[in-house]
């Protein structure tokens, strides 16, 4: 899994993902796509988000018998906007990890 390294790559990735999966909007700041077959969640900012254009790729992984989630973020805004976006996406990743944890 690799998130975009440039704004142009982020847009190309968004176009590719949008052509293969149904979007699941989350408010007006994100568009989310679930790639169930590859256990991935793609999250793209919309123009309403201060850190636009940005993308996060969350992948469900198994390691040493445990299920977890890895997240990569490609942010192409100011340092402050990207730091805020990282906190948002990391919080989402933590929610996924918690949901996957054995109860």
Label every model-predicted segment.
Residues 1-53:
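N-terminal secretory signal peptides
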Residues 51-57, 68-70:
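Short, surface-exposed coil-to-beta transition loops
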Residues 58-64:
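Short glycine/proline-enriched loop/turn "hinge" motifs that connect secondary-structure elements
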Residues 36, 45-48, 61, 71-77, ...:
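A mature extracytoplasmic/lumenal domain signature
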Residues 74-103:
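C-terminal partner/receptor-binding element of secreted or periplasmic proteins
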């Amino acid at each position: 899994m690799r998130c975009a390294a440039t704004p142009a790559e982020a847009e190309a990735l968004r176009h590719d993902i949008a052509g293969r999966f149904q979007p699941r909007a989350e408010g007006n700041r994100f568009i989310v796509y679930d790639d169930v077959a590859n256990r991935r969640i793609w999250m793209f900012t919309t123009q309403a988000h201060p850190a636009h254009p940005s993308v996060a790729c969350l992948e469900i992984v198994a390691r040493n018998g445990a299920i977890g989630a890895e997240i990569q973020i490609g942010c192409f805004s100011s340092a402050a906007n990207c730091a805020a976006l990282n906190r948002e996406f990391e919080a989402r990743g933590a929610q996924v990890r918690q949901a996957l944890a054995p109860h």
